[in-house]
Each structure stands twice: as structure tokens, then as C-alpha cells.
Regions:
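Bacterial N-terminal signal peptides that target proteins for export
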Residues: 1-11
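Signature for the C-terminal beta-barrel architecture of outer-membrane proteins
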Residues: 203-371
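Short loop/turn motifs that connect adjacent beta-strands in outer-membrane beta-barrel proteins
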Residues: 29, 52-56, 75-80, 92-103, ...
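Transmembrane beta-strand segments that form the barrel wall of outer-membrane beta-barrel proteins
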Residues: 104-121, 142-153, 175-183, 187-191, ...
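N-terminal periplasmic/intermembrane-space "pro-region" immediately following the signal or transit peptide
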Residues: 23-122
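N-terminal signal peptide c-region/cleavage motif recognized by signal peptidases
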Residues: 17-21
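Well-ordered mid-protein domain cores that form the structural environment of catalytic cofactors
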Residues: 124-221
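Outer-membrane beta-barrel domain signature
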Residues: 52-53, 117-123, 151-155, 192-195, ...
């Protein structure tokens, strides 16, 4: 099936109209919401938001808690300065989410060609897409049933359930099952860990609901922290069919201006690969490199990457500026990641006219071990 360019443009226009009139409610700011991220990062750089912003999605509850904590710790004039266009945008977006707690959303889109580059912003990558979603959200739970159809050349899976999830809050932890986009890292154009460049992986997850600082005097230096653990099922159309994706990410905020993230991802098991408890334990402890672990050929339990990233937020001359980097090791040496790929960038917020703009310069080196 092939659609004409004129029909695709008509569908895209219809999609814009429908999306403008119906905003689905979610308990978090989704990976791909570029405008919301712009305002969130600006508030964090200005000292108007406590918490971490290196793992997406981010819950609305955590954002508003971090905003209130920042205001409470500031002098009256500084707190007044934080009530700006960035906080106003988030307040308006949160109110729209609350008012649309239950409903349905229809999204249509299309593209005449795949984009040359992808980024944090959500974008259509197939010739024609359509999705209908039924959603509902309560105080401690949220659910979304999304059924989509895609006509394109990226893969042969036309019927999809991407963006479907069921999540709930237990204590200060969020438990969920489903397939949602994730973005792990500080980059605007790319991420060396998880990103929305690929389709979301269906699976289970657990993450902190409120990334508050530890109360212990021994650990308070960590500052606000977040932990996310995921376990997903990959598809069969790959070198090792039906492998599992396991991942963990820890982000902490030791200084108001500095965030540090630690990430580990592993492809484990799958057809023709060991996937018993011994193989799982070998993957956990990093004994999965056949050249150094003593395992025989074909017994490597997993394929892993691990690394760190950071974001340093500054305000020279009251201009929000961010310096960030990400380093992911493709191999292991001495129990630590090695053969790194890297990403580095600089971003700045400007205030031309009545709005705000963000300019960034970002470079990525994806050749492992190039430095």
C-alpha cells in the first residue's frame, strides 16, 4: 500500500488539528515533548527546580515537588523571579493534563521520506501512521491502550501497541508494564543509551516516584536521586531473535548545578543463547566477555554497554547555559567499561521577543574506542 504525497499532507494537517483539540493525559512528561523539556531545563538552570532531568519520562508529581522545594529555599525576590514564562508553561500543561484525565485521542501522520536525523522531539518516520488511544488517570494509577497502524518500509510490523501502558504508585515507587519511549542522557539530538530513535521495548519497569535527597547525614551529599530499572522483550527480527533487554539507570544531583547519571544496559538470552540462572548471574557480574572470562564460544550470556553522563547548569549574566556529555563503554576491561563512544554539547537559552529560544551545539562520536 502506497499513499500519494497530497493525501499524506492532508492526513498530517488533520493530525495537527486533532492533536490541538485533544491532549492525552499522562502522569509524566513524555520523552519527545521538546517544548516541555526546554522549559524544565531552563527552570533547573535558573535554580528554580530541584531534582534530576537526565532520564525521561519525568513524572509531573516530581517536577512540581521540585519546583515547590526550590521556591521554599529561596529569598522572596529570587522566588518571584522563578514565577516566569517557564513555570507558567508547565502549570498550564499540568492543568490541561488534569482536566483530560479520561478520554480518547486520535493521531494521524505521514512523511514522504524518513528524516535524515532524529532528535529528542517526536517526529513521524513512516509514510503513513494512525493511532487511537483510550486513556485514564487517577491519583495513584494511569493506563493507556494505544492501537496503531503503520505503513512504511522500516519493518513488517504494521499493527502496533506502542505507547500502551499500565502504571501505579506504591509508596515512593512507580511500577509499570507496557511500551513507552525512554530517553536516557543529556543530549538534545541524540543519546548513546536509550532514545526514541527506536520503537519502545515492551516490558516491566520500576522507578522512583519522587527523586528526593536521602535523609541520612552519610548520604545527603548525593542530593536528589532517581533509579530506573527495566526488563523488556526484544523482537525476533534481529541477529539474536527474542533476546531480553535489561537496564538500570541511577541519576543523582550532588550540587544544584551538577547532575550525574550512571547507565548499564544488557541484551541477554534469546534463541540459541544461554538464558538460565547461571547465565543471568554471569551477565549481572559482567562475566560475559568470551575473550577474558574463560567462557567457551557461544556461551557469552549477554551483550552489554555501560557508562556515565553529566549536565552542568550555569547562569552567567542570568543566561541559562548547560554543558553536558555522555560516555558509553562498548567493552569491559578490569571490571570497568572500556572502548567508549562519546557525546558532548553546549546549550543556551535566549529571550528574544516575548518568548524564549534554545540554541545548542552537539557532537557525537559513535566509533567505540576512538579515544
Amino acid at each position: 500500500m502506497r499513499l500519494s504525497p497530497s493525501l499524506i499532507r492532508w492526513l498530517g494537517a488533520l493530525c495537527i488539528g486533532l492533536s490541538a483539540s485533544s491532549q492525552a493525559a499522562t502522569p509524566w512528561v513524555q520523552a519527545g515533548d521538546l517544548t516541555a523539556r526546554h522549559h524544565i531545563e531552563a527552570l533547573q538552570s535558573q535554580g528554580c527546580l530541584k531534582g534530576v532531568t537526565l532520564s525521561w519520562p519525568i513524572s509531573w508529581a516530581a517536577l512540581m515537588k521540585g519546583y515547590r522545594l526550590a521556591l521554599a529555599q529561596q529569598a522572596p525576590d529570587q522566588a518571584s523571579a522563578c514565577k516566569n514564562q517557564h513555570s507558567a508553561y508547565l502549570q498550564k500543561a499540568l492543568e490541561a493534563t488534569r482536566q483530560a484525565a479520561t478520554g480518547a485521542q486520535l493521531t494521524l501522520g505521514g512523511a514522504t521520506q524518513e528524516p535524515l536525523y532524529t532528535s529528542f522531539s517526536s517526529q513521524v518516520e513512516d509514510e503513513a501512521t494512525g493511532q487511537i488511544a483510550l486513556y485514564s488517570m487517577g491519583e495513584h494509577w494511569a493506563a493507556n491502550l494505544a492501537v496503531g497502524y503503520v505503513d512504511g518500509e522500516r519493518d513488517d510490523t504494521h499493527l502496533r501497541f506502542d505507547d500502551t501502558y499500565l502504571a501505579g504508585i506504591v509508596g515512593n515507587w512507580q511500577l509499570g508494564v507496557g511500551a513507552i519511549d525512554r530517553w536516557w542522557g543529556p543530549g538534545w539530538q541524540s543519546s548513546l543509551a536509550l532514545s526514541n530513535n527506536a520503537r519502545p521495548v515492551p516490558g516491566l519497569w520500576i522507578s522512583r516516584h519522587m527523586p528526593l535527597a536521602p535523609e541520612s547525614p552519610w548520604l545527603s551529599w548525593i542530593g536528589p536521586w532517581d533509579l530506573q530499572v527495566i526488563a523488556g522483550q526484544l523482537e525476533k527480527d534481529r541477529a539474536v531473535p527474542k533476546a531480553r533487554l535489561l537496564g538500570a539507570r541511577f541519576v543523582f544531583n550532588p550540587l544544584d548545578s551538577l547532575q550525574i547519571g550512571l547507565t548499564r544496559l544488557a541484551q541477554w538470552g534469546g534463541e540459541g543463547r544461554p538464558q538460565d540462572l547461571d547465565a543471568f548471574w554471569n551477565a549481572v557480574i559482567g562475566r560475559d566477555n568470551g575473550q577474558t572470562s574463560g567462557l567457551k564460544e557461544g556461551q557469552d550470556p549477554s551483550n552489554q554497554i555501560a557508562g556515565l553522563d553529566f549536565r552542568l547548569s550555569l547562569t552567567p549574566g542570568d543566561v541559562p547555559v548547560g554543558l553536558y556529555g555522555q560516555f558509553m563503554g562498548e567493552d569491559e576491561a578490569g571490571g570497568m567499561p572500556s572502548k567508549f563512544s562519546s557525546l558532548a554539547g553546549l546549550d543556551m537559552v535566549t529571550g528574544l521577543g516575548q518568548g524564549s529560544q534554545r540554541v545548542f551545539l552537539e557532537a557525537t562520536e559513535t566509533v567505540a574506542g576512538s579515544w
